[in-house]
Amino acid sequence: EISVRPFCFWPEKPGLGYITVSGFTLRQAAPQWATPTAFQEGLIGPHWSKGWIIENNHIYESKSVGISLGTPIGTGHATVRGKHMKGGTQREQEVILRALHTGGWHKDRVGSHIVRNNVIHDCEQAGIAGHMGGAFSQIYGNRIYNIHHKRLRHGAEVAGIKLHAALDTQIRENIIYSCYRGLWLDWQAQGTRVSRNVFFDNLSEDLFVEVCHGPYMVDHNLFLSLMNFRNMSQGGAFAHNLFAGRFVVQSELTRTTPYHFPHETAVAGYSNITGGDDRYYNNVFLGDNDPNKEPVPITFFEHLPLKPRDKAGENDGKPVMDGVPDDAVCWL
């Protein structure tokens, strides 16, 4: 048995917004591998439009992505080909600039989707994926499992949820398990909130935040796999989480990635990742009972003094995400 159709539900052209897809079983499609520098196909997706609701569906057996919130062919497709190839970082920067210049990447035209209460499994690349098209969206109440389970092919876009440029995106109340990787936020997680999710039995790690400048918020999650968090970013706030596994924290000085003006897609600047500017409050960390493991000093934990209730400001108790990334503040 082979799958030959690229989609189950997909608009022929970009820009067809405000469609609700609810209560379907969608299975057996063969979209192509969805890289951020190419046309990002999926078994179902809005095809670079605004305001879709994808809810209460059973989505499975995609050869690549289940739900794609990604880029159209007009922002660049398979630009890796050619005799004189540019590096991946340069090519992705150009895709972003093309999307801003000619592709209509703006809050009024693209994104702001709702993806909720779906069961997504047995997709070989990602359950949900997208570059830029998932900005300003809400992804919640989904059960995602067995992603990249068969190991038919492998690449750099494999996760239960894989998003680039998840600007102001809310990812909450999902259960993500038995995947190669749980949640991967790659580039431009700014104003992003990851809240009240459960991760377990994921092979690589539960959460990977890569070359993002923040500010972003991770709160009230259960991270239960052996590897919980790979942090190659800065400007994150982590509060009230349970971490039952290991961390990897590293800088990335060789790549420069964009950050944006608050709550919009316009690029404010570029920088590499020196690391740090992270805040950890009221988390629970469980050891792995390894008697041979030497303690590792941690220098980026910071606790601010609590204020009396009558002196608390209006932003106390919630993330402040109105500054550029090096001005990230989070009071908890």
Where are these regions (language model features)?
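P-loop NTPase nucleotide-binding module
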Residues: 57
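Extended acidic/polar, glycine-enriched regions
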Residues: 1-23, 27-31, 50, 64
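Glycine- and acidic/polar-rich repeat regions and solenoidal domains
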Residues: 9, 31-47, 60-332
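Catalytic cores of enzyme domains
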Residues: 54
